[in-house]
Amino acid sequence: MKMKKLMMVALVSSTLALSGCGAMSTAIKKRNLEVKTQMSETIWLEPASERTVFLQIKNTSDKDMSGLQGKIADAVKAKGYQVVTSPDKAYYWIQANVLKADKMDLRESQGWLNRGYEGAAVGAALGAGITGYNSNSAGATLGVGLAAGLVGMAADAMVEDVNYTMITDVQIAERTKATVTTDNVAALRQGTSGAKIQTSTETGNQHKYQTRVVSNANKVNLKFEEAKPVLEDQLAKSIANIL
């Protein structure tokens, strides 16, 4: 009987250790804020002596980004460019729209998976298994095992690996001496089974380039209030570095 109790205590201790190790490992590895930014396409601009830029920054996400345009303007100025309020007086146009800024699985934004931990599941399974070693008090032992599993779940709940992603579409236009002809084609839906094709042609003096910027902020128990400024800084830096 004494041996069975010792075995039960040992298994419960192991359960608690297993349930907590995953959470502890995540807390240690993700204790510092990590920020990564990627661009879907490289934009090559022709070298020019003109250094005037017009900014048009939009935000259609559900997050407040009221200070983003100011950060982008500061980053552009730091590169030696002048930000102007009139598009007609600017050599470059930078247009950007924040599509989404929210919690997101890294597989969706970066294509790689941050493996999680399974402490709580192991704790519950091992706890139930203790019953086989104490047939005289199966109910009580099962209760101890389930309690150990719940402790593991509580430990896991306190440690969450959080990733915030900001997705931004960017269009940059640069003036050119050549005449640029642009053909626009749009498919407009008509009900559920049809579409109307709309085409137009225009001429101008700008080459336009498009890219998408994806920024990730990753940390244990990360809140958006902490992620927001670094995500904005990374976006501003990436846009300014195109010039």
UniProtKB/Swiss-Prot annotation:
Coiled coil: none annotated. InterPro entries: TraT_complement-R. It is found in: Cell outer membrane. The lineage of its organism: Bacteria, Pseudomonadati, Pseudomonadota, Gammaproteobacteria, Enterobacterales. A lipid is attached at C21 (N-palmitoyl cysteine). Residues 1-20 form the signal peptide. Responsible for preventing unproductive conjugation between bacteria carrying like plasmids. It is a lipid-anchor. This is TraT complement resistance protein. One of its GO terms (cellular component) is cell outer membrane. Disulfide bonds: none annotated. Belongs to the TraT lipoprotein family. Keywords: Cell outer membrane, Conjugation, Lipoprotein, Membrane, Palmitate, Plasmid, Signal. The keyword Membrane applies. The keyword Oxidoreductase does not apply. A lipid is attached at C21 (S-diacylglycerol cysteine). PROSITE patterns: PROKAR_LIPOPROTEIN.
